[in-house]
Amino acid sequence: SKYRKVYDSQGQRMSGPYIITSSNPNELPDILANQKIADTIQVLHKDSKSYRVYSIMNDEKLKKLIIDELGLQENQVSVNYTKLFIPEFF
């Protein structure tokens, strides 16, 4: 992926997956419109209520970046680790 060079050069791996949600489900912020945020994530899935992403940041740093860049209050957005279900194929 295009992120491979970034996290290899930093000695880090992608973290996550994380679910990013808004406290108001009708007002999910457009995090991809912000280049600083977009450069730190890889979107796995987006719907009207959440984003599922991998990030080169941990959940706390990613949440702080989103809050700072989009001018949100801490209670307006959440970033939570989640497990992805990947079925086994035989």
Predicted regions and their residues:
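N-terminal signal-anchor transmembrane alpha helix of single-pass membrane proteins
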Residues: 1-8
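Structural motif
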Residues: 21-25, 56, 82
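Conserved short beta-strand edge segments in small beta-sheet-based binding/regulatory domains
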Residues: 40-46, 72-90
